[in-house]
UniProtKB/Swiss-Prot annotation:
The gene is mraY. GO terms for cellular component: plasma membrane. It comes from the Bacteria. Its EC number is 2.7.8.13. This is Phospho-N-acetylmuramoyl-pentapeptide-transferase. Pathway: Cell wall biogenesis; peptidoglycan biosynthesis. Belongs to the glycosyltransferase 4 family. MraY subfamily. Pfam families: Glycos_transf_4 (PF00953), MraY_sig1 (PF10555). InterPro entries: Glycosyl_transferase_4 (IPR000715), PNAcMuramoyl-5peptid_Trfase (IPR003524), PNAcMuramoyl-5peptid_Trfase_CS (IPR018480). Its cofactor is Mg(2+). Keywords: Cell cycle, Cell division, Cell inner membrane, Cell membrane, Cell shape, Cell wall biogenesis/degradation, Magnesium, Membrane, Metal-binding, Peptidoglycan synthesis, Transferase, Transmembrane, Transmembrane helix. The keyword Iron does not apply. The keyword Membrane applies. It is found in: Cell inner membrane.
Length: 360
């Protein structure tokens, strides 16, 4: 929004041209989102407490979690507000990729909001019925996938980039839509599964978003793209502003969500953030690298799949409890230890993902 204003004011004062610089707007985006989160956070938490919108704790979970009962949830509204507010201020709104990311993120956030609302306000333990949650996720992801496929203007936009290989870039054709669908829905639900401990999901999200911002910037810069031998995708550079907004909003939320948490993000936050990571990875053509960088999310998801599959097929559990972070809690690890060690793993996964830019 301010890009439009700056373009107009540049006619009268050339100094306003500074706001056309992408890196400056990215810095201002992260700072704006951070300030919005820190400013709005206390008010939101007090409002949630007043409305008694508190987390319900599973009876079969770790005993240490019983003290979390009643902690305000739906804090993901704070993240969404900061991301949307900062992105709308500092991103170039003529860029259609920006709108795709914001609309998908908002759509999944609404699905999560309805689920949270039914659970904590209407006291329905099931929340939004699983089939309806999956239906609306599928609708949003499918619309985005179809739009991106039919609006693509160059082959690189629908090709699969294989990490660590320079010249392996097969054209997906219509399979692109199927892959995009699974990446968006899968990443959204993976982040949702990870959000079980204080700060556990938000820090890996921050790291992955920052890394995706780097991928967006270099793939949207013709010189960097040529040097790194990756496809030049001119529309992706502007996604750096959205990625930094996610980083800023995430850091602001972590201020309140760090152990012991004052607020939880709820499905409104986890589903939205996961969808944002998924759609950005698709746009910058780094779906396979997302699988690497989001290694913690992958671990959490696979642990649930293994647990359910093993119990149905063999009548035995693989882990003491799934997702896997609860397994380590039941082994006696204090919650902060589980969280920080998973953060360290996430950092390692992200660094490996970034290394694919040169190790080709």
């Amino acid at each position: 929004m301010l890009v439009w204003l700056a373009e107009y004011l540049t006619q009268f004062e050339s100094a306003f041209n500074v706001f056309s610089y992408l890196t400056l707007r990215a810095i201002l985006s992260v700072l704006t989102a951070l300030v919005l989160s820190l400013w709005l956070g206390p008010t939101l938490i007090r409002r949630l407490q007043r409305l008694q919108i508190g987390q319900t704790v599973r009876d079969d979970g770790p005993e240490s979690h019983l003290v979390k009962s009643g902690t305000p949830t739906m804090g993901g509204v704070l993240i969404l507000a900061a991301v949307l507010g900062s992105s709308l201020l500092w991103a170039d709104l003529d860029n259609r990729y920006v709108w795709v990311v914001l609309l998908v993120t908002t759509g999944f956030g609404i699905v999560g909001f309805v689920d949270d609302y039914r659970k904590v306000v209407r006291k329905d333990p099931k929340g939004l019925i699983a089939k309806w949650k999956y239906f609306w996720q599928s609708v949003i992801a499918s619309v985005a996938a179809v739009y991106l496929y039919w609006s693509s203007t160059q082959g690189a936009e629908t090709a699969l980039l294989v990490p660590f290989f320079k010249d392996v870039m097969p054209q997906l054709g219509m399979l692109y839509m199927l892959m995009a669908y699974f990446v968006i829905v899968g990443t959204s639900n993976a982040v949702n599964l990870t959000d079980g401990l204080d700060g556990l999901a938000i820090m890996p999200t921050i790291m992955v978003a920052a890394a995706l911002g780097i991928f967006a910037y270099v793939s949207g810069n013709v010189n960097f793209a040529e040097y790194l031998q990756i496809p030049y995708l001119p529309l992706t550079a502007e996604l750096l502003v959205v990625c930094t907004a996610i980083v800023g909003a995430g850091l602001g939320f972590l201020w309140f969500n760090t152990y012991p948490a004052l607020v939880f993000m709820g499905d409104v936050g986890s589903l939205a953030l996961g969808a944002a990571l998924g759609i950005i990875a698709i746009l910058v053509r780094q779906e396979l690298v997302l699988f690497i960088m989001g290694g913690v999310f992958v671990m959490e998801t696979l642990s649930v799949m293994l647990q359910v599959g093993s119990y149905k097929l063999r009548g035995k559990r693989v882990f003491r409890m799934a997702p896997i972070h609860h397994h380590y809690e039941l082994k006696g690890w204090p919650e902060p230890r589980v969280i920080v060690r998973f953060w360290i793993l996430s950092l390692i996964f992200v660094l490996i993902g970034l290394a694919t830019l040169k190790l080709r």
